[in-house]
Amino acid sequence: MSVAVLGAGAFGTALAISLARKAPTTLWCRSKDHADEIRSTRENTRRLPGAPLPDALAVTSDIACLGAHDVILLAVPMQKMRGFLTAHHAALSGKTLVACCKGIELDSGLGPVAVLRDTVPDATAALLTGPSFAADIALGLPTALTLACDPDETGKALQATLSTDNLRLYRTTDLTGAEIGGALKNVIAIACGAVIGARLGDSARAALMTRGYAEMQRLALARGARPETLAGLSGFGDLTLTCGSELSRNFRLGLSLGRGEAFDPSITVEGAATARATAKTAQEMGLEMPITQTVTNLLDQRLTISDAADQLLKRPLKEE
């Protein structure tokens, strides 16, 4: 299988670097100037400085390059995915498309695989998700991710193609569970960042992670997912990494909220839109997701951090 990565952000670049160490790979950039710059310097200095590109990694801004590839990794922000797929439908039709973003579409409430199937129905849709930072992957540090794909035979072939010496993939056919785990951990990371930013302590963070995980499971099971999926890399694993590191943009957004500081609006933070979309879905489905709703209220400035903590602590006592 021949692989191309669409999207020259930090994560897309890191995946392309890792794959190119194994076999020739193509990285597609939206901007010709950006592609020319990367080709010239052999480094994506704008998005992933300090990570030189292997010789086997080709860089282009020509979408026609997809004709030579069987597998396309889509490293495109969740809220821009539908527009991107619609604009390039002809080039993507009939391919194996692997979404590499984590989130819920604000307008539809759909995850990345559902959006793929909705916009390019004749493509094979898969999802690559789990605990990872771009720099770790680019540097060749040990990383394990979840590859969600149905049917499993296609998943096996993709698993073999996309695994590298340092990037180990575990597969599942539970696309719904993998989608929800990867999306909602960003919401919980915002909450955890907020309590650390407000100096409410690591005990509060642990409580939010644990009860946030319960919310992730609640929604996933209501959507027909398997509980073991959420206990794996795409759920618990990603939650653990994202809620404990300032390398996470979602956690850093939470820190800013907790400290009462402004956050750079140019930085993509998938958890903000996901919180709003999920709060709406939970209300429609009659699910209790108080942490998700609280994060939405914080983002929309309907609550202060102090009020949010007070509101969560004063909820009716219940059995765990």
Swiss-Prot record:
It catalyses: sn-glycerol 3-phosphate + NAD(+) = dihydroxyacetone phosphate + NADH + H(+); sn-glycerol 3-phosphate + NADP(+) = dihydroxyacetone phosphate + NADPH + H(+). GO terms for molecular function: glycerol-3-phosphate dehydrogenase [NAD(P)+] activity; NAD binding. It holds the Pfam family NAD_Gly3P_dh_N. Sn-glycerol 3-phosphate binds at K102, G130, S132, K185, D238, S248, R249, N250. GO terms for cellular component: cytosol. Keywords: Cytoplasm, Lipid biosynthesis, Lipid metabolism, NAD, NADP, Nucleotide-binding, Oxidoreductase, Phospholipid biosynthesis, Phospholipid metabolism. Pathway: Membrane lipid metabolism; glycerophospholipid metabolism. NADPH binds at F11, R30, K102, A134, R249, E270. Its main location: cytoplasm. The active site is at K185 (proton acceptor). It is found in: Cytoplasm. Its EC number is 1.1.1.94. GO terms for biological process: carbohydrate metabolic process; glycerol-3-phosphate biosynthetic process; glycerol-3-phosphate catabolic process; glycerophospholipid metabolic process; phospholipid biosynthetic process. The keyword RNA-binding does not apply. SUPFAM superfamilies: 6-phosphogluconate dehydrogenase C-terminal domain-like, NAD(P)-binding Rossmann-fold domains. The keyword Nucleotide-binding applies. Catalyzes the reduction of the glycolytic intermediate dihydroxyacetone phosphate (DHAP) to sn-glycerol 3-phosphate (G3P), the key precursor for phospholipid synthesis. Belongs to the NAD-dependent glycerol-3-phosphate dehydrogenase family. This is Glycerol-3-phosphate dehydrogenase [NAD(P)+]. It comes from Ruegeria sp. (strain TM1040). The gene is gpsA.
